[in-house]
Amino acid sequence: MDISVYVASAFSKNNKGGNKAGVVLNEPTLTTTQKMAIAKQLGYAETAFLTESNCADFKLEYFTPKEEVALCGHATIGTFAILMHLNKIHKSRYTIETNSGVLTITIKEDTIFMEQNQPTFYDTIPANKLTGCFDLNLLNTNYPIQIVSTGLKDILIPVKSEADLYALEPNFEEVKKVSKHYEVVGMHLYTFNVDRIICRNFAPLYDINEEAATGTSNGALACYLYKNHYLRKENYVFEQGYSLHSPSEIFVNLVISNKDEIEKVYVGGKGYYCEMQELSLK
């Protein structure tokens, strides 16, 4: 059985870089095992499978080479970039059924925004619990290390400077152990000033040592920065992927209520069609 798979890059910067994902359109008969096999053959962090939905415009399922995950920001942006490439987008608002619920996609010109879940703030973690993961002297102790989710749980870890962020060498086996212990997808490391927020993301538990652009992690980080009054904006731009030579830009827009609470979280980015691959399934 041959399957056509699109490859898209999401969260690209100036039509370059970004994070690649596989996109499979309208193959409703594929089994979970086959979807996993496709994701593994492609070898990208995630592959999205789009089918019809009874409760939304589309149904999207996401597979890493190892297992199914509830949600994936860059694979969603990538899917809609492919639909735009195929001239199948005819309105500015769509709904998608995912294992994280029904979410809204908004398209503004060439930028695709994806609604996230409202933020959930979990435990803060003492730095010594990360011993062995990387050099703890590079961490910025002015800000708490915390687990936050807008769909997927990540440990948000502040680093002193951009130079320190790139100098940091993770021990992926230790990162994997800590991620498993705290039941998170991975670790999202960041440094920021008034003008820039720069990140790196490690998810070796899901066979992704480092990822060039992560939508859900930056959605969580925007909420963390806003709620704690560290950097208050309604529109954030996160930069990621430089250490992988794949510069990426992730936009996060927060909708804030009159009571100064985060009502909605939208993660957005640009994307482009890369190629099409034909895979053989046994």
Where are the regions a protein language model picked out?
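Active-site proximal loop and beta-alpha junction motif in alpha/beta enzyme cores
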Residues: M1-L71, I77-K282
